[in-house]
Regions:
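Extracellular glycan-recognition regions
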Residues: 1-188
C-alpha cells in the first residue's frame, strides 16, 4: 500500500549503472548484466551462504521507524531446479537471517515464507521491517494490492544489509532472473 507519507530512502531502477550504495558478494561478472532498466542475474548453483552475485546495500536503521524494501522479480526462464529462487535476503552482522523469495518447490512456484502459490512470471516483493519484526508481502503481476505471505521476528539490528539475489540454479543452466525498480521506503 503506497501513501503520500512514504519517503524514498534509496532507490535504483538499474538504468545506466549500479548506484554506489551497492556492493557484490561473490561477484561473477560474466553472469550479471544491466539491460533495458533492469538488473539480470543468472541463477547459479549454491546456497544462502554461498550465493554468487548477491547485490547488497546497507539496510535502513530499523530503530528509526518502519521501512519497506521493494523489488520486482521476473523469471526469464521458468525454474526447473528444486528450491531455485530469487528475491530479497536480509543480512544481520554478515549472515543471511531472512528471505522473501519466489521459489520452486516440488514443481510449483511459491512465495516464501508462507508458501503462497505464485503462478505469474512477475511479482513485486515488499518486505516491511520494524526494530524487531518483518512482514513479507507480495503483489502478483496484474494485481493492484499487496497480499501478506507471513510475519515474524528479526534479531536486534547489527550491521543490517539488504540483498537481491538468486540461487539454487541448475548446473550448466541458463536461467536468468530480472530485478526492476528496487527501493527502500520509510513508511512510518
Amino acid at each position: 500500500m503506497s501513501s503520500s507519507l512514504e519517503t524514498i530512502v534509496f532507490s535504483d531502477n538499474f538504468d545506466g549503472g549500479l548506484d554506489d550504495n551497492w556492493s557484490w558478494l561473490r561477484e561473477d561478472e560474466k553472469n550479471w548484466r544491466l539491460a533495458d532498466g533492469g538488473l539480470e542475474i543468472m541463477v547459479e548453483p549454491g546456497l544462502a551462504d554461498t550465493v554468487k552475485n548477491a547485490l547488497v546495500c546497507p539496510a535502513p536503521d530499523r530503530s528509526q521507524g518502519t521501512f519497506a524494501i521493494e523489488v520486482t522479480v521476473y523469471n526469464h526462464t521458468l525454474p526447473t531446479q528444486q528450491y531455485e529462487q530469487a528475491g530479497i535476503t536480509w543480512y544481520n552482522d554478515g549472515k543471511p537471517v531472512f528471505k522473501e523469495v519466489k521459489e520452486l518447490i516440488d514443481g510449483d512456484l511459491y512465495i516464501i515464507p508462507g508458501k503462497q502459490p505464485m503462478p505469474t512470471k512477475s511479482v513485486r516483493l515488499r518486505l516491511i521491517v520494524t526494530a524487531n519484526s518483518w512482514e513479507a508481502t507480495y503483489q502478483p503481476e496484474g494485481e493492484s494490492e499487496f497480499k501478506v505471505a507471513a510475519t515474524g521476528e528479526l534479531p536486534p539490528p547489527q550491521n543490517d544489509q539488504v540483498s537481491i539475489q538468486c540461487y539454487h540454479g541448475p548446473e550448466g543452466g541458463e536461467h536468468w532472473i530480472r530485478f526492476e525498480d528496487f527501493c527502500i521506503k520509510k513508511i512510518s
